[in-house]
Amino acid sequence: MTMTIEHGLQLQDRRDGVGGLYTIATLGSHSALQILKGARDEGFNTLAIANRETERLYRSYAFVDEVITIDKYSDFMSLVPELEQRKIIIVPHGSFVAYLSLEDHKKMRIPYFGNKAVLDWEASRELQRQWLTRANLKLPRQFRTGAEIDRPVIVKLYGAQGGKGYMFVRDAHDFEERASLLARQNYILQEYVIGVPAYIHYFYSPLTGKLEIMSMDRRYETNVDSLGRIPSSAQAGMDIDPSYVVVGNSPLVLRESLLAEAFRMGEDVVRVSQEICGPKGLFGAFCIETIITPDTNFYVMEISARIVAGT
């Protein structure tokens, strides 16, 4: 692994945190710009750990004080001994989930914003479903085998991959014809709920005991969000498979009459987390990913126990 270090601002001893200054650090990916801009606004030093394709981007922002370049994000753990000698606080996001293992997260001794006990419940689709069920959230039906499928489903791969590899399946026969595409991959078979996607961004502070809804968004996915521009009659014979790769996020203002239920869901998710993960439970930023049906019911697809890209 090769590494370079660049200082964006020449403040006295910023890198060593002299004078009590902490540095907020994160991988240069996913939602790093939101995290580092917010950290700078709150008076912290900032550090982006980028790869060779992204280092130029992060060096171009004035609120990024320092950039460390590594060959690939999975090399992050080799930096840990150096970072442990500094006044660093890691703020994780989806790329930490994608590129580091659970064991990597747990053995890190750098101060880490978030409760690592939550990671097991987020990473396991089965445990996550137990958590959300105990919080009295409506969940789409889940199928254990392809033979059980009796309605349209979406096949979801494990991990934070921005929808990559997701697959729409009409019925059991359709699944069997395409199952070879899923060889040696972990996935779930989830009922496809028709409605409006709404990703609700929360922040829970254990210091004040208060929960906030900060924002909401919709995700733009290629190519599924462009298929509606093609008349259904024209789609016949085109042999187009919908894909769900996220390419961007758009702000969403939720109808006010739905806010009470959105808030209730967040409160109950936090409450149950304190039962299953210890008194600290889930804190900081998190996102409940929902579909809102025509009868204005929320169906929860999953939870991200951290900041998400649209926050």
Q: Could you tell me what each predicted segment is?
A:
Residues 132, 150-168, 185-195:
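ATP-grasp fold ATP-binding core
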Residues 202-274, 304-311:
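ATP-dependent carboxylate/phosphate-activation module, predominantly the ATP-grasp catalytic core
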Residues 51-153, 161:
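Conserved N-proximal alpha/beta basic substrate-recognition cap immediately N-terminal to
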